[in-house]
């Protein structure tokens, strides 16, 4: 889900070819930009966050979990912190494709759902204010 930058068109074509060659078109959809992302998360069996560059905070994962989706992601950056706390079953060692496949199968067949989201704006704001208050006291 999401737009494709011009610099990533070849990569998208490669992914689409791979999906086609594995006969997975009925399982994997490339949607492009969408305004109804919450609805997409709600009907998704699994949401993947497999960015090679570690993100400081995985907002897409928080959004997906808030919609009740299971999430699988690399064990680095913000993804690691979020999944460790909310859905540790979805953590995969960076670039370990066999582990990714195994984890995906386990998550897909499991009834486990992510824990309640603790990364809310209200909670994080209160934590920041508490930190500042402790520093000035």
Give the positions of each predicted feature:
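Short alpha-helical segment that forms part of, or immediately flanks, the ligand-binding pocket
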Residues: 38, 61-66, 80-81
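Active-site donor-binding acidic/aromatic loop of nucleotide-activated sugar
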Residues: 7-12, 25-33, 40
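A short hydrophobic beta-strand element within the catalytic core of glycosyltransferases
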Residues: 47-49
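Nucleotide-sugar-dependent
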Residues: 52-58, 80-81
């Amino acid at each position: 889900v999401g737009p494709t930058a011009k610099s990533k068109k070849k990569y998208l074509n490669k992914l689409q070819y791979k999906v086609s060659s594995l006969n997975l078109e009925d399982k994997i959809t490339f949607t492009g930009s969408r305004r109804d992302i919450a609805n997409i998360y709600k009907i998704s069996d699994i949401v993947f966050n497999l960015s090679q560059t570690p993100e400081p905070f995985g907002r897409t994962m928080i959004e997906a979990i808030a919609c009740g989706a299971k999430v699988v992601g690399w064990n680095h950056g913000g993804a690691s912190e979020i999944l460790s706390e909310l859905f540790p079953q979805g953590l995969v060692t960076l670039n370990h494709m066999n582990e990714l496949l195994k984890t995906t199968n386990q998550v897909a067949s499991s009834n486990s759902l992510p824990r309640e989201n603790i990364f809310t704006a209200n909670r994080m704001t209160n934590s920041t204010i508490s930190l500042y208050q402790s520093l000035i006291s």
